[in-house]
C-alpha cells in the first residue's frame, strides 16, 4: 500500500496568486496542489491536499488523519502558526510526523511571525523557498 501524505493549507492560502505576490509568489493554490499531485504520482505515494480558513476545521482534519491512514502531514498553518495552541495540540495528539512549510522566510518578516507554535514538535521546518518548499517537504516525507 502506498504511503499516504496529507497537505494542509491554512487561512488565506486560497488567495495565493493574487495576495501579495511579491511575498508569496504568483502561483495559485490550485497550481501548487496540481504540481504536488503530479510529483506524488511520480514518487508512488497517495496525496490529499486540503485548505481551510477556520482553525477548528483544520483541527478536525488533523484528528481525522489519525483514523484515515495518513502517514505524514505537510502543513502550512499560515497565520495560525503564530497563534494556535489548538493546532499544536492536535498535531501532538495524533502523533503523525509532520513538516511545517512557509512560502516566505518568516525571519525576514514582522517580528510577530518569528515564533511558531509548531516548529519544536515538527520533524522539520521549510521557510522561504516559495512553492518549492512543498516539493522539498513531499520528497522528504516519502523517505521518512
UniProtKB/Swiss-Prot annotation:
Active site: 24 (proton acceptor), 102 (proton donor)
GO molecular function: 3-dehydroquinate dehydratase activity
Keywords carried by this UniProt record: Amino-acid biosynthesis, Aromatic amino acid biosynthesis, Lyase
Keyword Transmembrane applies: no
Listed CDD domains: DHQase_II
E.C. code: 4.2.1.10
Highest taxon, organism lineage: Bacteria
Pathway: Metabolic intermediate biosynthesis; chorismate biosynthesis; chorismate from D-erythrose 4-phosphate and phosphoenolpyruvate: step 3/7
Catalytic activity: 3-dehydroquinate = 3-dehydroshikimate + H2O
Pfam families found in the cross-reference section: DHquinase_II (PF01220)
Enzyme class: lyase
Amino-acid positions noted as binding substrate in the UniProt annotation, renumbered to this chain: 76, 82, 89, 103-104, 113
GO biological process, one term: aromatic amino acid family biosynthetic process
Site (Transition state stabilizer): 19
NCBIfam families reported for this sequence: aroQ (TIGR01088), PRK05395.1-1 (NF003804), PRK05395.1-2 (NF003805), PRK05395.1-3 (NF003806), PRK05395.1-4 (NF003807)
Similarity-based family: Belongs to the type-II 3-dehydroquinase family.
Subunit structure: Homododecamer.
Protein's job: Catalyzes a trans-dehydration via an enolate intermediate.
Protein name, entry field: 3-dehydroquinate dehydratase
High-level lineage: Bacteria, Pseudomonadati, Pseudomonadota, Betaproteobacteria, Burkholderiales
Gene: aroQ
Amino acid at each position: 500500500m502506498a504511503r499516504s501524505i496529507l497537505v494542509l493549507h491554512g487561512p488565506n492560502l486560497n488567495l495565493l496568486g493574487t495576495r501579495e505576490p511579491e511575498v508569496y509568489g504568483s502561483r495559485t493554490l490550485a497550481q501548487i496542489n496540481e504540481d504536488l499531485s503530479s510529483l506524488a504520482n511520480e514518487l508512488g505515494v497517495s496525496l490529499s491536499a486540503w485548505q481551510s480558513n477556520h482553525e477548528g476545521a483544520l483541527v478536525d482534519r488533523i484528528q481525522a488523519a489519525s483514523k484515515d491512514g495518513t502517514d505524514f502531514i505537510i502543513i502550512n498553518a499560515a497565520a495560525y502558526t503564530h497563534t494556535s495552541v489548538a493546532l499544536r495540540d492536535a498535531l501532538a495528539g495524533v502523533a503523525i510526523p509532520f513538516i511545517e512549510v512557509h512560502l516566505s522566510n518568516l525571519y525576514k518578516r514582522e517580528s510577530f511571525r518569528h515564533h511558531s507554535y509548531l516548529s519544536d514538535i515538527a520533524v522539520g521546518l521549510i521557510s522561504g523557498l516559495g512553492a518549492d518548499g512543498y516539493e522539498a517537504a513531499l520528497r522528504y516525507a516519502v523517505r521518512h
